[in-house]
Amino acid sequence: MRAFAFPCGDCYRSAAGTFRTARTTTLTISAAEEKIGNLTMKRLNSSSFRKVLVALSIIAIVAASSSLAQQSQPRTQEYWGQQFQTNRKPVAQQHPFRPGLNASERLRHWNEIAIDASGLDHTPNQPGDTYVFGHQLGPGRASRAMAIVHIAIFEALNAIEGKYESYVGLDTVDKHASMECAIAQAAHDTLCEMFPSQSPSFNQLLTEDLNDVADSEAKAKGIEVGQSAAAAILALRNNDGSETPEPRIGIDWITSNDVGRWRQDPISLLPVALGAHWGEVTPFVLRSSSQFRTPPPPALSSVAYATAYDEVKALGGDGIVTPTSRTNEQTTIGIFWAYDGTPSLCAPPRLYNQITMRIADERHTHDVVELARLLALVNVAMADSGIAIWESKFYYDFWRPITGIRESDPGTGPTGTGDGNDLTAGDVTFSPLGAPASNLNGPNFTPPFPAYPSGHAGFGGALFQILRRFYGKDRIPFTFISDEFNGVTEDNHGNTRPLIERHFSSLSEAEEENGQSRIYLGIHWSFDKTEGIRLGNRVADFVFDHAFRKRR
């Protein structure tokens, strides 16, 4: 027998991703069961093994939740710094179960639970709250979490139907197993691992769901396959590189003073280099994080750079300190697509899951296995795009417009040399519209990581390319209401934004607007958008061609 240490204490992650800890909870297990932490494990054929894995997960969740409740406020400040506060209320309890849901409706129900759990995870907690801020903070971690949840759901359903290749090597089971119970159990188990302090809510939701299904052998088998699917993907993602905590600028991460290099946002002073190590995470399907690394950005002395510079300078100003030629509609577009990690909204993966479900509903995608496959494809493509994008971001370390425009002229910036481009005219007070500090009290901001390529453009490129491949065409009209404009979300002055619905005639129209929105906010260059979309498209094609394929 050997003793394994399961983490709690000063935690940054759930047990599935390996915590950074100050203390541990120890459990003795047999040597045969050490395979839990082995990324090379491909099959789970032992029922006892699965039960041990589930038990270990529960122990880790309980231990972690208790300790993490004491850590949330310092962790909030580690990410947002001293300028931001929120009065936002939790969203986790807004999913009352409706009796009689079929399997497809249950999948939609648990998808909503998952993405709103991520929204709550990005909401700094208030006195009396039982959840903890930031288990899966930021676009990379959020996309990984959603991929894990939706792989588990797909694997559970596919084990029952057996139509597609298994991602984790799960054997097929009795076709009479309850799909409804399989969905609920797989979602529950993975969500508890991803967001351990929210597990009491997930437990209640699972109980309500399972109580709606009469006790039977089919119910028991559905629960079992849901547990197996969750355990399998959690084991595969253990020690995948996501356990590395986010470095703090000036402490764990020293930014460069060189011309063209990324530096901290001088307005918000966000104190982290978010995703600085995310390019080291093992991809889900890609061969490596650098497989589709973007080409270098334009040289600072080039006409291409000057053209992009002039565009964001003209369109991206805040209209107060910096004048702008941006129209009211362009301002709306900039905010509409934002979801910049602010309370309740979460990061872009939540937005793109909402769009996926909207299109699936409008396309009448009601077959539960097909819908589960679509969600697995979308979320895995986004997760791998996130890894690939952040690998390129920190490889090139390219500056944001606020830095590039303020330091364009000779005599500005740390070196005083300027950008060396006679076609650019600097503005040392340039103030972008910025990523909206929705549901926060604090300034709009430039996200705390390098510009090139754009994460939004890359995630969007992955999403819309998967949708094109899945449905076989680009001309899919749809309407969508963003949570940035849902009649509830507040701006950083406490004003409730109106409800706005936007219509798109095709996927490519939405894809382009999503990428362009970042230029309207003044936080990205046009080449960030172009190469971000291209990278996301390439990742999506690779994922679609290599995962969740029909059995031959």
Question: Residue ranges of each PLM-predicted region?
Answer:
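Short, Lys/Arg-enriched N-terminal segments with co-localized hydrophobic residues
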Residues: 29-40
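Acidic/polar surface patches and capping/hinge elements
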Residues: 70-552
